[in-house]
UniProtKB/Swiss-Prot annotation:
It comes from Tropidechis carinatus (Australian rough-scaled snake). Keywords: Calcium, Disulfide bond, Hydrolase, Lipid degradation, Lipid metabolism, Metal-binding, Secreted, Signal, Toxin. PLA2 catalyzes the calcium-dependent hydrolysis of the 2-acyl groups in 3-sn-phosphoglycerides. This is Acidic phospholipase A2 2. InterPro entries: PLipase_A2 (IPR001211), PLipase_A2_Asp_AS (IPR033112), PLipase_A2_dom (IPR016090), PLipase_A2_dom_sf (IPR036444), PLipase_A2_His_AS (IPR033113). Its cofactor is Ca(2+).
Amino acid sequence: MYPAHLLVLLAVCVSLLGAASIPARPLNLYQFGNMIQCANHGRRPTRHYMDYGCYCGKGGSGTPVDELDRCCQTHDDCYGEAEKLPACNYMMSGPYYNTYSYECNDGELTCKDNNDECKAFICNCDRTAAICFARAPYNDANWNIDTKTRC
């Protein structure tokens, strides 16, 4: 094999290894984060909602600690309902991977009419949650809690 071919092969392998180490993040979560920022006018970073109470973040169990945590529980339940829809029950079409069309105008969120049934349902789950987050008080004491003892 020629040295130039080996260099190209090595470069491809290195780039593939680098891409494999990037953690996958469902695309819909980016949209949901943007909706949250729209609804709360950027007053609180989205990451503050990722590990809040018993339901905000991955998973969820127990009794919500406050109104904001109830918003997350309702959002989780909404995604659960989306997964039951025939339009949303095939691979990569569920709530975490299905992107949708929406608009943000001065804090007002609108799910666009061009979304199919699954996308419209998921968009409405995210829209409702983002509005709920914006209205609910944020208690710093409920961020990054020990869910094993408090939930």
